[in-house]
Amino acid sequence: MKKHRRKVSEPLPELSEKAKEQLAEAELRKLRQQFRKMVDSRKSSNFRNQRMIASQYKEIENLKAEQAETTLLLSLVKSPKNLDLNQKNFTELRFLLQTKGDYEALISSMKVLLGELDDKIVQMERKITNQRQIFLKTQEANNPRKLQKQIHILETRLNLVTVHFDTMLTSNAQLRKDIEDLLFEKAAYDHVYQQLQRRLQTQKKTMNVAIEQSTQAYEQRVEAMARMAAMKDRQQKDISQYNLEIRELERLYDHENKLKSFLLVKLNDRTEFEDQAKKQEAVKIKKHGKKRKGESFESYEVAHLRLLKLAENGDLNQLTEDFLAKEEKNFARFTYVTELNNDMETMHKRTQRIQDDIINLRSQQQSSHEGTRNILKQMEEKLRKTTEDTDIYENRYREMSKTLEYLKNSVEKLFKKINCNATEILGKLGETGKITDSNLQQYFAIIEKKTNDLLLLESFRRLQEAEGPDVDVPQPFVNPFWGGSALLKPPEPLRVVPPVFGADSFSDKVEEVPHRALSWVQWNTLWTTVASGSWSWRTTFRRNEEKNHRRHCWRRGTR
């Protein structure tokens, strides 16, 4: 009967189970489709959010960079160093304006003195023509004794004039050397200036490369931070989902444990009941050995009755099927829990690996930032030193160029005032009539020749005045270019340097000649010595020396 009942009752649960499986599969497909759609929508929303966050980060960083630049510019403009520099420039400009007024007054006085000298030269030329006529008339009537005396006087005066002429030549030679030194120093400073310009360009190129590298590193850092944020969000979501699943599984596991404990209690009750039945059967077997078959059947009936009591509707097949289904569900849940545990372990490993990568990236980023900062500091220090050197050399170059320009202008004015002839210089190829570095020595040679001619004319005039009819004792020779004979010194053995009428090549002597700068005081001394007497020489020298001393003290204090 049991076999027949099982055969009859088996097809109905198979159909219901298949229908359930089909319904479950259909619902599972729907859920998978919904899950895929939700995953795709979440991915697209995450991608859009990441792009939006990255763009916002870039805009924030750009605004921060602009704010830093503006604050830096404001701090530089309002820094006490720049304010002190402006004050120093103002004081220097005021001092230069004051010196400009002094020099303009000196130039006006020199112009007046040169005009007076021109008038005197014209008068002297007229007197010389008159004296020549008188000399031709009175030459035959001169006494030989007086001639001897005059010859002796003129020889002494000529000796004194030659001494002064030699000193003039030595001073001119020294000035030529100073001019050559200035030209050589100018060439050397030009060479150094070009080298510093090249170094400055290379430093700027290296700075641009370093800035590009730093920007690339910063962009990589921003990308890594965005990835880290996305991974953290994903990790938080996975952890929350995992916690929910774990809670659900724990709830199911507790329910299954309760069910198993209930089944075990039921089975224990059944085993106790079976033990009692076995004992009774053993007693019955001992007593009644012949009735074993009937008793075994009775025991089966007792077990069957107990199972019917355990079953709800009295269906033993349903009870066994429920028990097997529960066991299968428990086994499936157990396998699902093990898979979840494995997934959790893999997720923990992945999160640990990601955290290690994040730590490594942070350490690499920090080391790269420190390296770029050190490189930028070194480059800034080198740039500061090079800019200081370039400023120093530029200031020196400006001073030397101002000195040379002032010297050229003064030589040109003196050349025009004493009516020198520049046909020898203009006859050369490439000359335009302007004073340059190459033809400056030629102009000096022509000026020196003209001064020698003027000195000879003055000596001849003195000779004619000394030969007057009523003059017994001649007046002492007074040189208009030296202020009087009171400053004359006894003759000393000096080496006479003849004037140079050509331009010397100095391109091969840049390293041999020591570099000395012709100061403003030396040029003013030379100007006043040639143009006026001893009183102007002394006062101008003292005044310019004091100004130069004050200027040097002020520059040292500012530097």
Curated annotation (Swiss-Prot):
> Which residues belong to the signal peptide in this entry?
none
Q: Which domain of life is it from?
A: Eukaryota
Q: Name one GO cellular component term.
A: axoneme
Q: Which InterPro entries match?
A: ODA-DC/CCD, ODAD1_CC
Identify the keywords attached in UniProt to this record, alphabetized: Coiled coil, Differentiation, Spermatogenesis
A biological-process GO annotation: outer dynein arm assembly
**Where would one find coiled-coil regions in this protein?**
14-70, 185-261, 364-414
Alphabetized PANTHER family for the sequence: COILED-COIL DOMAIN-CONTAINING PROTEIN 63 (PTHR21694:SF18)
Record's function text = Plays a role in spermiogenesis. Involved in the elongation of flagella and the formation of sperm heads.
The identity of this protein, by name, is Coiled-coil domain-containing protein 63
Q: Which organism is it from?
A: Rattus norvegicus
Specify the taxonomic lineage. Eukaryota, Metazoa, Chordata, Craniata, Vertebrata
